[in-house]
């Protein structure tokens, strides 16, 4: 979410922190006609109020519009105007207010600060104790903006990146997350185009995105995260800025989003840019974005995925089917995709109603299933001959940790969310998978997708390299130009005639 630091990309390159004082020093040195905050992530967005008060011109979406998107009460008024739903929620400043709000909304609830960065300090609370623990941490840091308490709804999460010129909106594509709401969008596996979306819901998303972008008077990029729960569309949040999915959606759709957004910020109209308005046509392939993690370098960090972002990168899998694209993405992210061996399963009580069908897929593929006692009892009801494994404190020589160390396990499914304390069994198990380089799936949706992928029998020998440009209806002109100072000849490629000239 930052500008490239290549010396030959920008006219100027400053290595300075994004603080009020340092940014003002750069502005004084450069004396620009205006500044763009939309490409600096949430950190840059937080500078908008300060810059506006200093009389600095904000190019693109105004400081006022950004504040409406971030201010709960003002944003709720906007949603009410267009009949757009959002999960019920309240803004609080104290522990008592947070407990009262959680009781009113009913558990589970999602707790997060305003102007949140990367899901930082974001958590799902299931009890009063969870709220007390969270608020103690937040209040100790000192808060300037309210803490948001939202009703947590486990539905299908979707993401839309739009370009707006203030009058029209272009939506290059709609992405669907494999993991249900509750896992940070940066840690979710995202699929383009969305594969479970009805025509009716697609139209609602298009209309809602257009209304929100225009009513907020956005000029440039806007990222909107949606939730489908019981066949109703809810807005999770609207970010009037560039998101981490911009490079992904630009690449797979062929829409140069940064270029078009910058032109819109400077006053050009979308209808004059050649890409139309509304929802851009679907690409003839499936593209899957898979997150990459670096848990092996982080000591005592739980690899359970939740509202707080933990990934450090991402890879892209492209193919004609979802299963093949997912297989490519998982291989690229470091999964070995082993097709025999053992699967160890331990899930929280709320997941036991769903784990049976998922475990059956692994069982039918020939995997040996191991599980903790409670989970094993559930699996046996589905005809799965699961081997019951003792917990860490129940046996020193034959427990969950020794099983993982034995080399019998190829995949671990562990969904217990109680992961803030390193001494807990669930955290120890997940950390052991990191040490042994065993894929650990902390969401049932990820485990289900992996099982379907293994069931499809794709391998590195049966997949093929895809040139997405060849599959598009309109080919893109690719130019390889000479780089300064290295003395190499350049190659000019025109994909219209598929010949190098």
Where are the model-predicted features located?
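ATP-dependent carboxylate activation and anion-phosphoryl transfer catalytic cores
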Residues: 1-32, 43-45, 57-60, 82, ...
């Amino acid at each position: 979410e930052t500008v490239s630091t290549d010396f030959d990309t920008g006219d100027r390159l400053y290595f300075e922190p994004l603080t009020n004082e340092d940014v003002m020093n750069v502005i004084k040195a450069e004396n620009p006609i205006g500044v763009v905050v939309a490409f600096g992530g949430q950190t840059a967005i937080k500078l908008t109020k300060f810059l506006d008060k200093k009389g600095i011109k904000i190019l693109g979406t105004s400081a006022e519009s950004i504040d409406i998107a971030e201010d709960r009460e003002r944003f709720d008024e906007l949603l009410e105007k267009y009949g757009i739903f959002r999960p019920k929620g309240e803004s609080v400043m104290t522990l008592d207010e947070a407990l009262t709000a959680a009781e009113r909304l009913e558990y589970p609830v999602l707790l997060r600060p305003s102007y949140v960065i990367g899901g930082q300090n974001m958590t799902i609370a299931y009890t009063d104790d969870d709220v007390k623990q969270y608020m103690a941490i937040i209040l100790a840091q000192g808060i300037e903006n309210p803490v948001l308490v939202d009703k947590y709804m486990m539905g299908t999460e979707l993401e839309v990146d739009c370009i707006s010129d203030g009058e029209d909106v272009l939506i290059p594509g709609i992405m669907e997350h494999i993991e249900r709401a509750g896992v940070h969008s940066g840690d979710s596996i995202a699929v383009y185009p969305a594969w479970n979306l009805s025509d009716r819901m697609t139209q609602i998303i298009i209309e809602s995105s257009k209304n929100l972008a225009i009513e907020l008077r956005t000029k440039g990029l806007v990222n909107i995260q949606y939730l489908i729960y019981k066949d109703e569309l809810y807005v999770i949040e609207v970010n009037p800025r560039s998101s981490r999915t911009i490079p992904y959606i630009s690449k797979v759709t062929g829409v140069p989003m940064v270029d078009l957004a910058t032109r819109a910020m400077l006053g050009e109209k979308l209808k004059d840019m050649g890409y139309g308005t509304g929802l851009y046509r679907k690409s003839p392939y499936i593209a899957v974005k898979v997150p990459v993690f670096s848990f092996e370098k982080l000591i005592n960090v739980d690899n359970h995925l939740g509202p707080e972002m933990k990934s450090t990168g991402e890879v892209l899998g492209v193919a004609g089917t979802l299963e093949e694209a997912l297989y490519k993405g998982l291989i690229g992210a470091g999964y070995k995709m082993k097709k025999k061996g053992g699967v160890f399963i331990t899930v929280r009580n709320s997941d036991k109603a769903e784990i049976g069908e998922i475990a059956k897929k692994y069982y039918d593929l020939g995997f040996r299933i191991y599980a903790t006692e409670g989970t094993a009892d559930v699996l046996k009801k589905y005809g799965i001959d699961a081997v019951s494994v003792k917990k860490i404190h129940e046996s020193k020589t034959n427990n969950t940790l020794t099983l993982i160390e034995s080399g019998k396990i190829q995949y671990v499914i562990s969904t217990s969310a109680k992961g803030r304390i390193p001494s807990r069994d669930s955290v120890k198990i997940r950390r052991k998978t990191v040490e042994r380089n065993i894929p650990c799936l902390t969401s049932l949706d990820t485990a289900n997708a992996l099982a379907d992928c293994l069931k499809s029998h794709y391998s590195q020998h049966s997949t093929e390299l895809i040139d997405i440009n060849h599959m598009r209806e309109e080919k893109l002109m690719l130019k390889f130009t000479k780089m300064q100072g290295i003395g190499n000849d350049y190659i000019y490629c025109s994909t219209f005639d598929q010949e190098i000239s």
